[in-house]
């Protein structure tokens, strides 16, 4: 019989955690309101509140053991939120890079620009497709581009410390295709010359990317002409004239992709249909929003898996700390609990009281961990090798309200498990045995 009760208890725990994980904050608020109503309006609820009040009033006497729960859970929440904020910041940076009124065309079955290649004839045909916006001279707003890897010395690094940056060769219409890109220092590069404009993120990460300075790329000296800002992944790149980049790196007349500005977002369908129906072309067509969102998925998933794995490992430690602390608290209050049972308190108020005490400590730990994660990591700059590129992507960690809520749910879940088993043990404690032993 005891085995069946314990098995049912485990099932209840698993089911409760499964529901809690997917519960939105309005659902949690509703549960809190229902619990408060039960505590205030029912006899057993008032009994549970009385017992919980006694336990909470003794927390000062158990400050050390209580701090173990709070600090442990705060650590879990802080680390979890920080790692998930990294995934959120990475994903957000790539999502902001694209839009629905720009399209990108690559060779068919290419997963990214790095793996794509378009010959000169294909590039010419793509620029003539329907749906592309045109400038005042009637020229299509299409930028044939290629990407190559370049190594540059890192800022604040040793003499031999280098990092990979993505060098993008762009066409003359690149600025019109991406109007969000603004020069913040210097000027644009001159077509036909070995000149560069560098993203703000790349300038922060690599040494020598200052207007007027020379850097060596592909065994050639290049002059840095300016610095641009865009608020997206492009800030991690450096740009040069596509023809010059192709000559320097032996790419001939081929290009990795063609990025176009559409006449309007609704024109994408006609643009894609025209290219896919052309028997001379074998290409993949997507909006830049879809392309960069897809590029972010794999790395975002990896970072989230790492964050959750680390969080689970730390949560197990915090949970055992909570179990140990609450079992000790129940043992120390065995006579008090037995006396309450003897004068008519049922088992349910005792269970709820112990659970409330543990959940209160867990809530405090979750709030502390969430606040620390927001203060320390929100907006913190980081960089990593971006999926589908050959360079580092600079981004900022983003601690969102959703991530803070996720951390708080983890904290309360740890408190729930850490308090439930000691609470059930307290409720099952035989009254006569407890009074006789103590």
Regions found by a protein language model. Give the residues of each.
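N-terminal Sec/SRP start-transfer signal
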Residues: 1-11, 36-77
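Peri-transmembrane interface segments
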Residues: 2-17, 90, 264-320, 329-331, ...
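Short helix-loop junctions at transmembrane helix boundaries
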Residues: 6-31, 367-409, 420, 424, ...
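Hydrophobic alpha-helical transmembrane segments of multi-pass inner-membrane transport and secretion
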Residues: 63-90, 300-336, 359-368, 417
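Hydrophobic, regular-secondary-structure patches
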Residues: 74-166, 187, 192, 273, ...
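Mechanotransmission and gating elements of multispan inner-membrane complexes involved in transport
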Residues: 134, 153-163, 204-307
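Short beta-strand boundary microenvironments
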Residues: 161-205
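Transmembrane alpha-helical interface segments in multi-pass membrane proteins
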Residues: 320, 327, 332-381, 406-414, ...
